[in-house]
């Protein structure tokens, strides 16, 4: 086997492994982005612990098939990049969607999140979901609200009794 084919097979195996290990993978069309914009996007990904790579489409197609992500194959045309997340399933979609709002050249294509296929519409919906921390804060505040109301009620009753005694 030639060295070129061996190298290509190695890259396909690497991409397949990333698809299998990641909890989220989002493919974007980056055509028209300037170098500074791509650098800015990569910095945002780095902060969030997301890996952003550009691979040849033929290699990504083979890797997607190997990883059982057939739905993705049809959309792997044109200049594509893929963002892999191993911790936060929403981070790649959120970062890319926010970035695309200010940079019209960036286009969300498809993705997989925890084994489920997402098209562009679903990725945008996913990106609008608040972060885990925000959701936990909302949940805790909803638990806290009845207790706070009860405490205010007790205080009002105590104040009323104090007024009646005086």
UniProtKB/Swiss-Prot annotation:
Keyword Heme assigned: no
Gene3D superfamilies recorded: 3.30.70.1730, 6.10.250.290
Cellular component GO terms, alphabetical: ribonucleoprotein complex; ribosome
Keywords of this entry: Ribonucleoprotein, Ribosomal protein, RNA-binding, rRNA-binding
A GO BP entry: translation
Molecular functions per Gene Ontology: large ribosomal subunit rRNA binding
Family: Belongs to the universal ribosomal protein uL10 family.
The protein's assembly and partners: Part of the ribosomal stalk of the 50S ribosomal subunit. The N-terminus interacts with L11 and the large rRNA to form the base of the stalk. The C-terminus forms an elongated spine to which L12 dimers bind in a sequential fashion forming a multimeric L10(L12)X complex.
Biological role stated in the UniProt entry: Forms part of the ribosomal stalk, playing a central role in the interaction of the ribosome with GTP-bound translation factors.
Stated name of the protein: Large ribosomal subunit protein uL10
């Amino acid at each position: 086997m030639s060295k070129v084919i061996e190298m290509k097979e190695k890259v396909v195996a690497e991409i397949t492994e990333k698809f299998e290990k990641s909890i989220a993978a989002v493919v974007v069309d980056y055509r028209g982005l300037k170098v500074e914009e791509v650098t800015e996007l990569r910095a945002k990904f780095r902060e969030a612990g997301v890996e952003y790579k550009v691979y040849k489409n033929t290699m990504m197609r083979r890797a997607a098939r190997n990883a059982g992500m057939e739905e993705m194959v049809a959309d792997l045309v044109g200049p594509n990049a893929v963002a892999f997340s191993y911790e936060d399933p929403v981070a790649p979609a959120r970062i890319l969607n926010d970035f695309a709002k200010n940079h019209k050249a960036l286009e969300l294509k498809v993705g997989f999140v925890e084994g489920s296929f997402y098209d562009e519409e679903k990725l945008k919906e996913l990106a609008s979901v608040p972060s885990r921390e925000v959701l936990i804060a909302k949940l805790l505040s909803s638990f806290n609200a009845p207790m706070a109301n009860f405490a205010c009620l007790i205080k009002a009753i105590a104040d009323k009794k104090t007024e009646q005694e005086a």
